[in-house]
Amino acid sequence: MADEAKKIIVTGASGGIGRAIAVEAAKAGYYVICHYNHGKEKAEETLSLITTSGGEGELVQFNVADRADCKAKLDSLTEKHGALWGVVSNAGITRDNTFVGLTGEDWDAVIRTNLDSFFNVIQPLVMPMARKKKGRIIAVSSVSGIMGNRGQTNYSASKAGIIGAAKALAVELASRHITVNTIAPGVIETDMTAAINEEAKKIIMQTIPMARAGKPEEVASLAVFLLSESASYITRQVIAVDGGIH
C-alpha cells in the first residue's frame, strides 16, 4: 500500500482530533505520518490503531514551535517520501485565563504553538507540493477563533490568525491546484475539554443548539473528505463542526 497510497502528515496525532484524523485517513487509504512532540507512547498508540486496522504510517517527532526543528525534520521527510499529498496542521495548546490574568509566557506559548506552527510546519512542505501541482492543506482552527471566547484571548487570537493565514495561502496556491481549508471545531470530546469542570460543562452545553459535545471522529470525517479528490474545488473555506454554536 505504501508505494501507492497518498502520503499525508498530521501534527498533534497523539490524541484527540489529531488521532481521529490520522486513524480515519489511514482507513481511507492514506499513508499517515503521525507527528508528536512529547507524547511518544500516545503517538505509538495512534500508529497501532492505524496498523491493526490495515493501514500504514510512521511516527515523526519535532516541536511545532521550533522553526529550525520543523524544517530539519520536514526536509528529511520530503527527501524520504517526496512531495506529500496532504498536510493537516492540528497541533495546539491552551493556557486559559482572563486577559488581565495572562502572563507574557501564557500568551507567547499559545501563539508559538498554535499560530507560528502554521508557518513552521506548512512552509517547508509547500514547495515540493507546488512543483507537483497538487495537494491538500488543512488547518485546524476553532470556533474560538471565529467568535472569541471569554478567558481565551490568547487562544482566540491564535486560532483567528490561522483562519486569516489559511485564506491568504489558499489564494496563493490555487493556481497550483493545492486547496487550503480550515476546520473550526466547537466543543469536542478530547483531553482538552475533559479538564473542564462539570458546572462549566453544563453552562457550555446550554449554548450548543445540539446540546452535546462533538466527537473527534465527526471532525475527522470532514478532514478526510477535504483530503480527497472529491474536494478539489473547495478551497479558502472555514467549516465549523460545532453543533450550531455560532
Labelled PLM ranges:
Residues 14-15:
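Conserved glycine-rich cofactor-binding loop
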Residues 98-99, 106-111, 204:
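Substrate-binding pocket helix/loop in short-chain dehydrogenase/reductase
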Residues 30-44:
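Conserved glycine-rich Rossmann-like NAD(P)H-binding loop of the short-chain dehydrogenase/reductase
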Residues 142:
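Residue(s) in the substrate-gating loop at a strand-loop-helix junction
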Residues 127, 171-175, 232:
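Alpha-helical segment proximal to the catalytic Tyr-Lys
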Residues 122, 158, 166:
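Active-site helix of classical SDR
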Residues 134, 178, 212-241:
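C-terminal substrate-recognition "lid" of short-chain dehydrogenase/reductases
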